[in-house]
Structure formats: C-alpha cells, structure tokens
Amino acid sequence: MLARQSQEPMKLHIFRALFVVVCLTGAFAERPGGFRVIGPGGGGAMFNPTISPHDTNTVLVSCDMTGSYITHDGGRTWRMFNLRGVVNFFVFDPLDPKTMYAHATGLWRSTDGGERWDLVYPSPSAVKGVKMNSDHADEQILADPDPLKAISALAVDPSNSKILYAAAGTKESPALFVSRDYGKSWQKQVGLAGVPRRLWVDPNSAADGRTLFLASEHAIAVIGPGGVRSFPLPAAVNEISLGFGSGPQPTIYATSEHGIYVSNDAGANWRKSDLPGAGANVRAIATSLHHPETAYVSYDHLTVDGESWMGVAKTTNSGADWKLVWKESDVAAKNVNDAWITERFGAGWGENPLNLTVAQQDANLAYGTDLGRTMRTADGGATWAAVYSRRVNDAGWSSLGLDVTTSYGIHFDPFDPKRQFITYTDIGLFRSEDGGLSWTSSTAGVPREWMNTTYWIVFDPKVRGRMWSVNSYTHDLPRPKMWRHNSVLHYKGGVCRSDDGGKNWTESNVGMDETGATHILLDPTSPVDARVLYVAGFGRGVYKSSDGGRSWALKNSGITQDQPFAWRLARSSSGTLYEVIARRSEDGSIGNAGDGALYRSTDGAEHWLPVSLPEGTNGLNGLAIDPESPDRLYLAAWARATGEHGDGGGIFLSENGGKSWKQVLDKDRHIYDVTIDPQDPNVLYAAGFESSAWRSADRGLHWTRIPGFNFKWAHRVIPDPLHHDEVYITTFGGSVWHGAIDGQRRDADIATPVLEPGQ
C-alpha cells in the first residue's frame, strides 16, 4: 500500500493533504498561524462528556491534562480549546444554543458556540494576578473581592438565562449562591452541610420559587420555597445522576463501592439495584434528564458464567433490571468498534468508562470516556464507536481532534522526509510514513516493561534506517510525582536499536542497569562502525557506548549527586559535552542536596566538571548551545515554588561557557526547553508550562510570544525542516501542535484580556 502511494502523482498527494486538513478543521474558525494538532488521537484520560440540550451533535469533553474539546458534528471532528487549567464541569444554557459554561481556574462562558470564552467569575475587574509557583504551574486566580471562593457546581435557570445558581465557598463553609444578572453579582442563599458535586433545577417548579437538588458525597439537599431538606445517601457515592420524568419527584441514580442505588422520591428512600452476575465494581452512572427511566452504568470485574467482564450496562426501567450492552474481557466485544487503541494494546487498556453522559432529548444517545478514548452510541448501546481517531489507510490513524498524549519530540528521518516519529508517554513511539498524515505504533520488539514511554530517538546520519531509542516504563519524568514516592533505582528501561527505520527494534542494553532512560546523544564525528553514544539514565547517571550501543559503561566521574537525576545531554561544535541533572526537590528550597546541576566534560564523558548556575536557580530543564559559538549557552530553567510566580525560572544566557549568566526571559518561569533553528542560529525557540511558546530572532536577547499556541503545558518547539516559517510544539498532554510562527496577533480561546497568556 505504501509503495503504491509513493508512485501517485504529486497533485493527488497535495489534494489528499488539503482534504484531510479541511475535513478536520472545516467546522471551526482557524487558529492564528493555522495551528492544529497532529498524531493518532486519544491516548489519555478524558472526562465530563456533556451533550448540548439544543443540538445533540454538539458535545464537550475535558481531560486531566488541561485541554478541553468541542464537536459540532457528533464526534466526527473536535476542536481543542484551552482555559489555562483542567476543566472540571461544563453546563449548557438551556435557552441559548450558543451559550455554554466551563469551570477551570475560574468560571468561563462562551456565547459563540465555544470559539471564545469570557471570564465570568471572578469578575475580570477583581483579578489582581495569577499565582502559579507549583511544579505544574497550576494556576490560582487572585481576586478581590472573591465572595464565592471555589465553585463546585453550577446550573442555569430553565426559563431565565440571567439566573445562575452556584454551589460555592470553602470546604468548611459551602453555600448556595444565586446571580440574577448573568454572573455579575452574587447573593448567598443558604449554607450547606457538604460540598455539592452536582446541582439541578427542577424544570417543573415555579419560576418564582425554584426547587433545587444538590448532591454531595453523603447527602441530597433539596432547596425550595419551604426551606432546606437533607436526605442521607445510603453510602458514600462515587457518581450521581438525576432525571425528571412524568412523576412528581425525580429519579436519582448513585454508584458507590457497595454497588448501585436508585431513588424515585428525590432521595428520601433508596433501593439497591444489582447487575446480572456477581462481584461487579461500578464506576460512572448517567441518566437522561428527561427520560430518567433509562440509565447507563460503567462496570468491571463482573463475573458471569465463570468469566470476568467489563463495560457498560443499561436499564430502561429505573434499575429494576440491567442489560449488559458493552461486555468485554480480554477479547474486544463485537459491538464495540474502537480505533487504534484496542488494535494495539488490547480491549482492557482503556478500561471501563470513567464518565458517562446521556442526551436529555434522546436516551439512546450516550458517550463514555475512559483512560484513552471517547466512545459513542446512538442506538441505546447496541453498538459503540470510537470518536477520537480515524483510519487513513491500511496501517495508519489520524486524530479527530481529541488528543490527550504527552509528547517529547517529533523526529525526521534524514533519508526520508516523509518518515516521521513522535516520542510519546503512555503509548510509546509512533511513526508516520506519509509526512504526518497518518500514524502507527512503532514499538515492535521493545521489551514490554519498557514500552510505556519513548523519551527520545536518534538517527545515524550516515546509515539509512539505523536509529536508537531510549525507553522506560516510568513516564512523565522529570516531574516530581514520578519520584516522590518511588525509588529511581526501581525504574525499568533502556536502549533499543533499529536497522529498518523504526519498524522493528532489538534491546541494546548490555552493561547498562535498568533505568529510566530519558535522552540519547550521538557523536557525529565517531566512526560509522563504532558509533559513540551517550544516554541519560534518570537516577543512574551518564552511560557511554563506543560500539554503536552494543555495550555500555557508566561514566559518572566528577558527578557528586547521589542517584543523579540525569535528564538531558548536549554537545557543542567543539566536542564539549554537557549533562543536565534535574532537581530532586519541590519545596522551593535551594542550596541543598535537592538542587539540580549542570556538568561539562571535555574528554568524552570520562570526567565531569560542575558548571555554575544562575543565582537563585536550581531547576534546570534544558540546554542549547550555539553551533557557531560553543561558549554561548542557553539554559531553560524551572521556577522554585516560592513567591507568587515562582523564583529562579526562565531563560538564561551565558557567553563564556557557564562562568556567568544573565536572564533573557523572565515573564515565563517554567521553561521546559530552548531550541535553536538549525538553519539560522540567530533564531531560538522556547516553551514551558505557562500556555506559551516563544521566539527570539536576535540570539536570545529578546523574545516574542508565538500567536495561536496556548496549550497550558508545553514541552519544546521544533522547527519544521520543510517550511522555515512553521514549527512543531510538543506538549505535556496535548500531543504535537503544528503551525506558522507569524500568525495574526489575536487571542485564541480566551477573550478576557487580563487572563490572556504570556503577560
């Protein structure tokens, strides 16, 4: 198939590429610079699917990696939008089909179908700043006044869009608040016993005396003209869902570690509802707001006929009985039509749905989101289909816009510009043979216990098809969450080699301890038949091979850190090696054993000497070296958790090999990496965890933000080798972005100036 494609006329290739781009972006306004996300799609946990009450083709989904997604065509295409943090719920206006709400760091509202978002709460005029000094640069809007504090649930009045109900406050003093002016001002109505997770307005109640239902972990609170009534839940609940039918009281479904519970009288009384079989664990549950007799529940470890199953069950009689409409074991169910994830990793990889939603207009339409996918049924569960990826050809897949993958680099085969690779977390290495139009898993031969993450690859510039990869079971390094409670000496991983362009791999690890191998560097001056390679082993140090990776030796002479967090390597044009040691503290301290470090070697890693760091900096993350001036160094630094914005982070420049430093970018203090344009050393790029990517055209002295890119957690910018005005940007949870650097300077997604990124 690939060979036949390569012989097609160029016009057909161009048409096909344009067709793919138009199909994937035609429903949405173009971002500045034409930025779009590439890759196979899916790959990470998705949450909070929410279907519009006006148009069932419009659906919102969030993830745990800060991106949010919207479709207007029933999942055929999605657009990512970014609100500077993880969205924990969506609410559609029941009267205006263009208006919707999302709660992330604050409460946001879109009035144009999800294209642009305005901050509703806190009021933009009350915003005094943004605190983001933590390792993930998690954001807290600093506002004064701030009467609501944290909002945990929201509802819009069914007959008046100006009236908003919010469960808000602190954990110690939650309360119900109401706004009658579209969120401009709020009045406290009543205190609550627990923090509500969900909030519903009874559409059948009087407009001048609404009845509200608020669900917390342990109780249902009913608030109406007669005051507040509280009904205890039968157990601490994981999920809860409510619907209003023809009866006087709503039907409520809840899941807990003890099973499913159903109430037909607003929570006053509960009955247990069991799935067929035995031993089921239940997770998500959802009913249709206007068809509460129908509900779907996510389950696993259900034993039927001696076998264990997972999937989704459905009731059409308020839990009197359940039918298993998605039933899988190790073998994929015939009625579940997944994309590449089941094909590559098996039926259990994504697990049973984390969240479910059911259309309030049509109880046969439901979505389920899991650890890597969004799945859809339009026939009441008779069939389920993936809506995160589509097959492009016999071997490749392309994203539909739902991308929740962490990427470290995009890599281009020096002998074939159409062959590209993305190094991913959780799903390992992916390969494209058609210039990025489609992608396929490329980890055949990698040991199973290493397959989770491919951190980096390197090509032999003289031997077609020869390449090396560094892999690990441990993902997301160097983030502290990965080593906070786990010994780095227990990490699994190492080096693999391919001689057929990444199609097949063999372990190439002799002499190397199992390690979280995070970077690999090839000395281009070494003999072709005896390539010199260097590897950063996180928690081990630096390994060197002088025989093309067949054998390795640890080279830590001069490195003083115990279990050094070896993270990145760099080599100057003069042959000097640099090793970046990641910080192993997260409390904001400095001047102790937790500091990161920079080392230099002038004898091929046989001996290492420390390089001074900028004052107040101990969290270095990347290093770039000017190819024409080997003493000109650019340091990417990660802020310490002190102050409002974090201290010691940004970009620093040394013109004397690290003897002294000056800061050249301060406004972004969580910089992941700096890269140099291989075609012009005057041009540099940088990115990090503050919703921005940066460009300098004067050797790093001044920086401007690249318009169009606004994913919260960026990794690195990689220039497009075929189009000098375009770049790729890898991310922590948003796959790979591709677009032009000279896009129109206007906001993308966020329409509130005080919270536009990069200020």
Protein language model features and the residues they cover:
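Extracellular glycan-interacting surfaces
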Residues: 14, 19-20, 24, 28-759
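Bacterial N-terminal signal peptides that target proteins for export
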Residues: 4-17
